């Protein structure tokens, strides 16, 4: 195996010719499969050793008894040192209280925080509430205003909030993002802090979604539509901004060639090494998804773990796993800080899971991989204008969470009819390891809902074991030629276009091209009929809510616009002038059988346990079930899940996130399921563990809806042992 990046001279020239240095005119030619085949099959980035391994700083696991951030702590470990609830007594866990916000029904993906016996959490009606953590009774409620720019994410604390204790100058505060603002609230009253920004909030230009971190007095957070920011946690003044898509002569700008400079978003989350002042960011796939012809190159800092100086925003290092990602294989979750043993020494590392099924394990200071990181020669594209990266990740250690590719032997055998139904789809599709897209033909891969998701991982600090929930769901995406004509700007918009701008453009974009997380509507007439569109407008689906109330005439006009009927005069589109405008795709679809179950063999959802000292998976068990299939005699299949796990010193792993609306407790050592309880709605965030009034609680956000599906609600549910139950600490 050759050490990357030591290419032989003639092969180095070939690799460079396939990289981001291509002139736009050359980019229209087909990729050279013969030149790609001359490259070595494997390359390897060597493992860190010697001085590149950072000795572990002192850390006291027993100190992890609070929940000051939605990810548990600044290192996103989701570990609790509490042990009143443990393997011996978890079977007696019961509901302690349920809080209903009563202000609507909405999917919430935020884990509450708990400080000093008070819980802070967002509600379905766009408020932040403070609850008595022991009883669930409301202490205060703050109503968050609508964002000034409706295209920005508008749920308060969508994926997290953080408590800052303050300092000699500033009082404690709750910090979170909402829409195009960062808010600072008084934890005691819920009132915005007047000395922070403008009346308790400061502008966040690219929208908010993740839970920030605080280093000394710098609050670091990320924008939904790109970039990472450092704010003064006292005053709200912006201190620095790091461009996740480099600009001008910034490092990495030459890895984007072409007109389609989309985003590379940190929507998975951040972590902080408080002692070293290093912020770690998980960066998602470059945009637009699936179509890379307008963004030739490796597309830094897409699909990277990025380390920044927390005080200045200066880049310290980055590690990119998927290059020129055209499959939406984000590093989707907050990096997790942990300690492992290498070369007989305790080493501080950072771990990050991806939708490609890769578990990155890197030294915190050098950024080098803890294990050799193998790359494999990747296929070339048949899509005119596309330029795939010569190599993609194929690591041996840590073992894959799940393979990124669909294989024919994966096809479901649930019933003969289900098998035949799926095989009919496979026969008309392309598939394979990092197989690029072909025009007009579905591509099957484990991607948009595969591997490790935004719910991320947790770590058992004393053992170094990492727990991650995962999905085995096959994406089915077709790239199509965008051959529509452009509307002549000399004519006024139709009534349907006006309705689209009012009701749809906020998510699908003014040009119907989507925004990377929302599918495009260009070419929708080729995949949906009038009845299907009308039904979708009226009922919504998954993360899409029903369209706002509109009269029949307005609805008909909107459908005409979407189906390209009765439109104003047009003129031919300028073919090939923009890589992004050459192609569109048919949405975020999945391979399913005749009854809507995943089109591959189970398990479809898993809880995985890693020993990261060795990089090996110790155990994995199905997560979730379809009771009707269990009754038919099928072993537990697992379900699609988006929630994440939390581990405790009681030897337990708690997680929800499944389609069956359950929360479960597993034995952290063996994976045995020890307890479960049904929730009023699905629990699509990780549980928090805390102590209030001398009693240990486990709380879960239970609001349903979202990408896993099911009805939406408004609940938080807390569990505890009965008051009379004897303590049995391990």
Regions found by a protein language model. Give the residues of each.
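N-terminal pre-domain segments of enzymes
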Residues: 28-81, 388-414, 573-583, 727-730
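Repeat-blade elements of multi-bladed beta-propeller folds
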Residues: 64-71, 106-127, 153-181, 206-228, ...
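Blade-edge beta-strand/turn elements of extracellular beta-propeller
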Residues: 95-98, 141, 187-205, 234-259, ...
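Short, conserved, GDST-rich strand-edge loop motifs in beta-rich repeat architectures
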Residues: 170-172, 226, 281-300, 473-488, ...
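Beta-propeller blade signature
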Residues: 227-237, 298-312, 365-366, 606-611, ...
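Conserved blade-ending motifs and adjacent loop-strand segments that build the rim/top face
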Residues: 323-326, 331-334, 376-380, 444-451, ...
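Blade-level signature of beta-propeller repeat domains, shared across WD40, Kelch, NHL, RCC1
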Residues: 464-469, 473-480, 688-730
């Amino acid at each position: 195996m050759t050490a990357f990046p030591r290419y032989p001279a003639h092969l180095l020239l070939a690799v460079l010719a396939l990289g981001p240095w291509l002139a736009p005119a050359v980019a229209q030619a087909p990729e050279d499969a013969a030149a790609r085949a001359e490259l070595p099959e494997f390359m390897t980035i060597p493992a860190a050793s010697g001085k590149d391994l950072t000795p572990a700083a002192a850390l006291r696991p027993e100190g992890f008894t609070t929940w000051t951030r939605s990810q548990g702590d600044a290192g996103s470990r989701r570990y609790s040192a509490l042990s009143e609830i443990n393997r011996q007594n978890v079977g007696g866990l019961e509901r302690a209280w349920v809080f209903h916000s009563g202000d609507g029904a909405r999917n919430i993906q935020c884990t509450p925080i708990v400080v000093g016996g008070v819980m802070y959490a967002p509600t379905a009606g766009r408020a932040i509430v403070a609850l008595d953590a022991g009883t669930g009774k409301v202490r205060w409620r703050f109503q968050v205003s609508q964002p000034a720019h409706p295209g920005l994410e508008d749920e308060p604390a969508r994926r997290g909030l953080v408590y800052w204790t303050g300092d000699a100058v500033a009082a404690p505060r709750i910090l979170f993002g909402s829409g195009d603002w960062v808010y600072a609230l008084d934890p005691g009253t819920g009132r915005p802090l007047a000395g922070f920004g403008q009346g308790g909030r400061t502008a966040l230009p690219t929208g908010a979604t993740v839970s920030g971190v605080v280093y000394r007095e710098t609050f670091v957070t990320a924008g939904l539509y790109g970039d990472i920011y450092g704010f003064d946690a006292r005053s709200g003044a912006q201190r620095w901004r790091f461009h996740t898509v480099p600009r001008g002569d910034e490092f990495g700008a030459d890895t984007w060639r072409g007109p389609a400079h989309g985003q590379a978003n940190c929507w998975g989350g951040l972590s902080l090494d408080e002692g070293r002042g290093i912020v770690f960011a998980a960066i998602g796939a470059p945009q637009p998804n699936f179509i890379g012809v307008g963004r030739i190159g490796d597309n830094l800092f897409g699909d990277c773990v990025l380390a920044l100086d927390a005080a200045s925003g200066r880049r310290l290092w980055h590690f990119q796993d998927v290059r020129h990602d055209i499959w939406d294989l984000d590093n989707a979750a907050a990096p997790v800080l942990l300690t492992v043993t290498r070369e007989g020494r305790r080493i501080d590392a950072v771990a990050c899971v991806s939708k490609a099924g890769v578990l990155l394990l890197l030294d915190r200071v050098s950024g080098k991989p803890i294990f050799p990181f193998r790359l494999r020669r990747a296929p070339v594209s048949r899509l005119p204008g596309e330029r795939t990266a010569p190599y993609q990740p194929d690591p041996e250690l840590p073992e894959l969470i799940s393979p990124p590719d669909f294989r024919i032997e994966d096809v479901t055998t649930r019933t003969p009819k289900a098998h035949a139904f799926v095989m009919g789809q496979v026969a008309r599709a392309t598939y394979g390891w990092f197989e690029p897209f072909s025009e007009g033909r579905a591509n099957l891969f484990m991607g948009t809902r595969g591997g490790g998701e935004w719910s991320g991982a947790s770590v058992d600090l004393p053992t170094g074991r990492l727990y991650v929930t995962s999905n085995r769901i096959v994406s089915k995406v077709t790239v199509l030629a965008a051959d529509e004509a452009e509307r002549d700007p000399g004519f006024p918009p139709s009534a349907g276009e006006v309705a689209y701008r009012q009701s749809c453009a906020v998510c699908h974009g003014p040009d119907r091209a989507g925004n990377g997380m929302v599918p495009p509507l260009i070419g929708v007439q080729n995949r949906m009929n009038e009845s299907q569109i009308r039904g979708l407008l009226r009922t919504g689906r998954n993360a899409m809510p029903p369209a706002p109330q509109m009269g029949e005439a307005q609805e008909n006009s909107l459908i005409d616009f979407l189906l390209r009927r009765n439109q104003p005069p047009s003129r031919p589109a300028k073919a090939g002038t923009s890589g992004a405008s050459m192609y569109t795709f048919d949405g975020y679809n999945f391979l399913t059988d005749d009854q809507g179950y995943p089109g591959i063999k189970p398990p479809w959802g898993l809880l995985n346990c890693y020993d990261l000292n060795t990089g090996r998976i110790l155990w994995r068990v199905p997560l979730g079930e379809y009771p009707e299939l269990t009754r038919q005699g099928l072993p537990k299949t697992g379900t699609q899940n988006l929630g994440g796990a939390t581990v405790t010193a009681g030897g337990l792993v708690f997680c929800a996130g499944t389609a069956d609306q359950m929360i479960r407790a597993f034995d952290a050592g063996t994976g045995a399921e020890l307890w479960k309880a049904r929730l009023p709605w699905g629990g699509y965030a990780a549980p928090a563990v805390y102590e209030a009034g001398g009693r240990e609680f486990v709380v879960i956000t239970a609001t349903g809806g979202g990408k896993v599906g099911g009805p939406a609600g408004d609940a938080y549910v807390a569990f505890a042992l009965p008051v009379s139950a004897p303590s049995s600490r391990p």
